[in-house]
Structure formats: C-alpha cells, structure tokens
Amino acid sequence: GQEAEETTAESDNAESCSLLEEGGSRFAYESLDAQEQIWYGEIEQALGEMTDTVKLSTEPIEQGLDEQDIDRIFQCVLIDHPEIFYTTGYTYTKYSRGDRTVGIDFAGTYSLPGEEAVRKAEEIRERASEWLSEIPPDASEYDKVKAVYEKIIFSTDYDLNASDNQNIASVFLG
C-alpha cells in the first residue's frame, strides 16, 4: 500500500501567468547543489505562476533529498525573487512505500488571488520605473545603487501592523 502524509505551512490560490522578473540575481540558487537546483526550478515556476500543485522530480529523492530540504530550497527561491511577495508559505504531500519516499507534491500558499497579485505586481513595476527614471542615465554604477538605496531608505515608513510589512509591496506601494 501507498501512504500519503500532508503537511501545511499556510493557505490560498490563483491563475497561470508568470509573475517572475527576468534577469535578477540567482545568488541563493548558486549556493545549491545540482539536485537542489532541480527542485528550486520547479518551486520557482510553481510560485511564479501561482500553480495549485506540482509534482517534484523524483531524481533528487533518489539522490537523498527529502521533505526536510523543501523549506531551505523554498527560502532560496524567496531570497532570489522578492517579486513573489504574495507567497505566504507552502504545503507538501509526501508519498511513501514503506520507509521509502516515492514522491512529493508541492503547493505554494498565497495572500492574494491571482488577479490581485498581477495588479499589485504591475503597480510595483510602475513605481520602480518612476524611481529609476529619476536617476541620470549617465550616473556611475555606484551612484545608481546609492540613489536606489537612498530612495528606499528615505521613502519607506515601517508599519509593523501593515499587511505587507515584510515585502516589496510595502516599500513601493506604502
């Protein structure tokens, strides 16, 4: 017989267009080994598309990864993708035969429905573009980074009671 064990780390859902930004840093991804990078890509795509559930590849399981590795890989995806501000956690379902794990399903959980996440992401992009347009195009790399840093520091008010107090939505949308 096959046994399924479900564990939750939060909950909600939505639609299928990618909200991932192109060309960002892959700092956390680079810290993972090849098997972990497989799951990173699958989790990244699932969260970016707000997919209901994805079956994680079994090769990493065969190479020794298990459900204990999901959270670390999930955190790496969030480190590399602040634009996934609408993700609140995940659930997974582990499939076993005896003591052996034979499959794991992964599902992100979301604070917003898909259309609202898309709308908020667009508002964030527009505000970011406004901020970037204030930087002279001939500024040095250092001056560009400094200008963005100062804009964030001087424009962000921290409100611990705000619903988005720990993500980019609070910085760009207040």
Segments (PLM) and residue ranges:
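Conserved hydrophobic/aromatic pocket- or pore-lining residues that grip, position, or stack substrates
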Residues: 148
